[in-house]
């Protein structure tokens, strides 16, 4: 695959995920351009990486030379034209199908003919996203987990017409950036979220039925060795985010087993979104420490 030698990767979106993915690619030796139309997002992304690497240098887990070398491979741009020359484009824009499609359309028009475009969606249809391009065979899903530089998993998701060659290139790229891959089906939630989020939803039903959040969390932490209970995880991720995923499963499968817990909907409507708002299933202080329960 002649394009693999180009060594250039473009990451679209400089938010939490895009920033982490760009960092992972640059650390692995790729030349990365992180593209975002918002200057504020780029400035924040730059500052985040700079701060993180400076902390590593201070702790002694990274040398100044290594830091300079990695940052030297990481450039930022507000211009989509800069996808030119990249063998791979990773899209990490907000999880809304219209934004994804607009982004893919734009990248498809500007990228080299043989460039592969992958989406970091956590559950939207790859085939639908690919349909707006002239290269649906060169489109697939590559779902990273937060924080992207640290989490070892990459869910690979083929669309209906993704080619074997595209899959092979993306799998090889995943290995080079130190990720272990799983082949996830092109259905809502892919693999991790389809198993994880219904567990969080079931835990919310238990709280709705009168169980204490601490009891539900302790049951799973001590009984199943989970590092974090399902209720605290929901607060941590954001109740709105978790509910959106659950609703996506429900609408995608049209199956009542994915019925979102009504308590979650009430909480979201009331503005209790979890740790980020200071109020969720638990109450939090300004520093984000748990100071009690709301149930």
Question: Positions of the model-derived regions?
Answer:
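Structural motif
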Residues: 12, 35, 77, 92, ...
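Rossmann-like NAD(P)-binding element
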Residues: 55-116, 123-124
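Helix N-cap / loop-to-helix initiation motif
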Residues: 38, 63, 163, 211-215
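NAD(P)-dependent Rossmann-like dehydrogenase/reductase catalytic/cofactor-binding core
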Residues: 2-5, 28-33, 168, 175-186, ...
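Rossmann-fold dinucleotide-binding core
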Residues: 116-185, 190-194
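NAD(P)+-binding Rossmann beta1-loop-alpha1 motif at the extreme N-terminus of oxidoreductases
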Residues: 2-55
């Amino acid at each position: 695959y002649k394009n693999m030698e180009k060594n250039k990767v473009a990451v679209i979106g400089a938010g939490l995920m895009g920033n982490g993915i760009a960092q992972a690619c640059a650390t692995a030796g790729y030349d990365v351009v992180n593209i975002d139309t918002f200057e504020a997002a780029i400035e924040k992304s730059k500052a985040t990486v700079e701060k993180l690497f400076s902390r590593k240098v201070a702790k002694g887990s990274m040398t100044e030379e290594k830091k300079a070398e990695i940052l030297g491979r990481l450039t930022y741009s507000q211009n989509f034209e800069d996808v030119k020359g990249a063998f791979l484009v990773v899209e990490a824009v907000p999880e809304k199908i219209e934004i994804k499609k607009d982004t893919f359309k734009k990248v498809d028009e500007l990228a080299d003919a043989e460039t592969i475009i992958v989406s970091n969606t956590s559950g939207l249809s790859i085939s639908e996203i690919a349909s707006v391009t002239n290269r649906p065979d060169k489109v697939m899903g590559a779902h990273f987990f937060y924080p992207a530089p640290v989490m070892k998993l990459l869910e690979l998701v083929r669309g209906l017409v993704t080619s074997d060659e595209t899959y092979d290139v993306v799998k090889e790229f995943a290995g080079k950036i130190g990720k272990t891959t799983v082949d996830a089906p092109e259905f809502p939630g892919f693999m991790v979220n389809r198993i994880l989020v219904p567990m969080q939803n079931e835990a919310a039903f238990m709280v709705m039925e009168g169980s204490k959040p601490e009891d539900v969390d302790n049951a799973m932490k001590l009984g199943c060795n989970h590092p974090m209970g399902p209720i605290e995880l929901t607060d941590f991720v954001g109740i709105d985010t978790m509910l959106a995923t659950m609703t996506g499963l429900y609408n995608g499968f049209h199956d009542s087993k994915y019925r979102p817990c009504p308590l979650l909907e009430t909480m979201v409507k009331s503005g209790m979104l979890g740790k980020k708002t200071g109020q969720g299933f638990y109450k939090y202080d300004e520093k984000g420490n748990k100071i009690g329960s709301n149930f």
